[in-house]
């Protein structure tokens, strides 16, 4: 099935600088010790959601291990926030900016109450979100272990460092960079790549473009796994879109997690960090041990490999200079390209209704399978109409 990307929101890394007014810390507290709790989760569109409360009110959290700390958006229904100042933050597209930092009221996850949890506050990039706040990797880095089973719909959370020691699984040590976990995987034979384990990213694997270039320089085997090259941009972080550059689409023979192989993996390059994303949970459980700094993968079906044969994005829309949606990335193999859409086209109207902003485009009530007429302005300034099937 064709995949269309409207927005990718990912990595939030709080940087320690001389000018910051609030630094990374894990001074929040847990209400329990020596506990084990099984908490229901939802995994929707390769994102992990947990129901809890903040200040006694229901709250839907998104668990994002690629975010160093919690975050929420201006206008969130979360109330009772206490300002802590500002911090310099870097997003998935590599943008830097100063953002507000707040302390949340007491929040609960299952039986656990967490006090003094800190979150960054960002401008809304979408008119609405399917969650109220993000829980970052600091939740585990503080000293917790968790096991996530998307198939069963639960997460086991514990502060017992040895609780999962005797469970099966293929483990990788991680090291913290900017307070988030990086592991070593092998995308090509005799090659390793340092990747962020990022449940805020949907795709199984994306590779940093500079890392790809190094791999390709060292081995002709890398180029044989390239399907297409396109100039454009597709990642939008909390602070803006990445700059246009070459994006490489690949079909990897295998992606190795230590001794386990994901076979026939489609992936693409990005200007941000290489990442393993939340769709790894389609194929097995993940256990994160915040004490031993290890991440374990256990395939649902056992064995030492799984056939992935996934699809990747073929088109991406990003905000243009005038605020309208622009085709930031488009492959020649896509239905949109065959219909006449071109990279750099600005979306001016949908079925004759003007699109004044990127948010208008995001809000449009598209129906899956229905065909629309887009009025687009090409890079030559000329307008034309293109059929578009959602």
Where are these regions (language model features)?
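Bacterial Sec-dependent N-terminal signal peptides
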Residues: 1-24
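Pepsin/retropepsin-fold aspartyl endopeptidases
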Residues: 19-390
């Amino acid at each position: 099935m064709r995949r269309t990307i409207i927005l990718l929101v990912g990595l939030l890394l709080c940087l320690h600088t001389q000018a910051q007014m609030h630094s990374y810390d894990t001074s929040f507290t847990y209400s329990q010790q020596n506990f084990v709790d099984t908490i229901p989760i939802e995994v929707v569109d390769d994102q992990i959601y947990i129901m809890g409360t903040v200040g006694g009110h229901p709250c839907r959290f998104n668990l994002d291990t690629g975010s160093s700390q919690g975050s929420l958006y201006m206008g969130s229904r979360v109330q009772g926030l206490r300002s802590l100042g500002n911090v310099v933050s870097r997003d998935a597209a590599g943008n830097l900016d100063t953002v507000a930092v707040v302390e949340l009221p007491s929040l609960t996850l299952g039986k656990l109450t967490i006090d003094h949890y800190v979150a960054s506050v960002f401008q809304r990039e979408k008119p609405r979100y399917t969650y109220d706040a993000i829980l970052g990797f600091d939740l585990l880095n503080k000293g917790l272990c968790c096991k996530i089973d998307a198939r069963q719909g639960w997460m086991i959370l514990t502060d017992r460092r040895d609780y999962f020691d005797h469970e099966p699984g293929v483990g990788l040590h991680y090291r913290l960079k900017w307070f988030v976990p990086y592991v070593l995987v092998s995308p090509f034979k005799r090659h390793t790549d340092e990747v962020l384990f990022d449940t805020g990213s949907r795709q199984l694997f994306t590779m940093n473009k500079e890392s790809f270039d190094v791999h390709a320089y060292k081995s002709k085997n890398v180029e044989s796994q390239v399907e297409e090259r396109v100039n454009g941009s597709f990642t939008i972080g909390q602070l803006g879109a990445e700059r246009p550059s070459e994006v490489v689409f690949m079909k990897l023979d295998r992606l190795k997690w230590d001794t386990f192989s994901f076979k026939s993996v489609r992936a693409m390059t990005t200007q941000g960090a290489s990442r393993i994303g939340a769709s790894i949970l389609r194929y097995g459980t993940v256990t994160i041990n915040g004490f031993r700094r290890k991440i374990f993968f256990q395939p649902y079906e056992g064995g030492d490999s799984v056939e992935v044969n996934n699809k990747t994005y073929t088109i991406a829309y990003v905000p243009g200079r005038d605020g309208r949606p622009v085709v930031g990335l488009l492959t020649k193999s896509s239905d949109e390209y065959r219909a006449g859409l071109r990279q750099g086209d600005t979306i001016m109207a949908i079925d004759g209704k003007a699109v004044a902003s990127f948010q208008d485009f995001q809000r449009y009530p598209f129906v899956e399978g229905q065909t629309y007429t887009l009025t687009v302005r090409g890079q030559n300034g000329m307008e034309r109409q293109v059929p578009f099937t959602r």
